[in-house]
């Protein structure tokens, strides 16, 4: 087997309890995970994962399942590079020995994903690592956690999966050439998160387009587009200059969180202040500035006003990528020239977007 399987074929294998390999983007973790629907897990499946894949066996679940089990997050301040939402590790409360064997780990997973599972059915810590998927799945965050829950959910299965990173014999991460060989050897299909995003995007949107109207700003007239986030209920704005074309580069600035401090702060934490971004787009007579709303409580607003926090670089919320990407795709933007410092943007290709360059703010 030497090709990427389309998502319908991946879904078909997941539905009958088979494992698949799911890969993410080269500019993200650039790894492949063994993945199967959690409700079909067996000791044999766990043994295959730990023997052949060698990574950490994790249990992606949707938020409702995590809350049902009363699982706290592993840390209140997530410093992981890609924001993976680990809860505390778990073990089945009954029927296991040390918890580490393939049979024990399978029983822990079976217990946790049972429709009748209760908090007292599991204990912490343990040898299985649950992951809380973002609501909205890969349309919000392009991770294996969300892909696992999506693939189960799209088949009408319990919204949980078992995943394990594939590692080479020498301890390095398996990349696509090794993953192709692994898939052929074990007769497994390979799917990509990018394809899953594209597949869902054809028929789904997490945003409701509320319409648009011209708006006057100190930097000229823009067309203001208003969107409501179906998951959070928050309102997002896009200020558009000109008519974006799929064939030409579009200046793009995605600004989040949108706050009064973006107007009055002399040294904002964003590389491009909002006024500078609007001025630059006005000069170019073409571009899009997106204002993503996120609730900012008193403590975080106070932190931004104090000297110690005023110049701290802003850390993007992983949910911002998916929401911003959907807005841009809906505006017919395809080729992005980003107003910002060079960085990687995960999962954009699944939305039909391409970053062709960056433009840093003048100091």
From Swiss-Prot:
Cellular component aspect of the GO annotation: cytosol
A GO molecular-function annotation: manganese ion binding
Reported cofactor(s): Mg(2+); Mn(2+)
Associated pathway: Cofactor biosynthesis; riboflavin biosynthesis; 2-hydroxy-3-oxobutyl phosphate from D-ribulose 5-phosphate: step 1/1
Coiled coil: none
Annotated region described as DHBP synthase, given as residue ranges: 1-202
Annotated stretches, region: GTP cyclohydrolase II-like: 205-363
Cofactor binding note: Binds 2 divalent metal cations per subunit. Magnesium or manganese.
Enzyme Commission number: 4.1.99.12
UniProt: D-ribulose 5-phosphate binding residues: 28-29, 33, 141-145, 165
Role: Catalyzes the conversion of D-ribulose 5-phosphate to formate and 3,4-dihydroxy-2-butanone 4-phosphate.
Protein name per its UniProtKB record: 3,4-dihydroxy-2-butanone 4-phosphate synthase
Organism for this UniProt entry: Neisseria meningitidis serogroup A / serotype 4A (strain DSM 15465 / Z2491)
Name of encoding gene: ribB
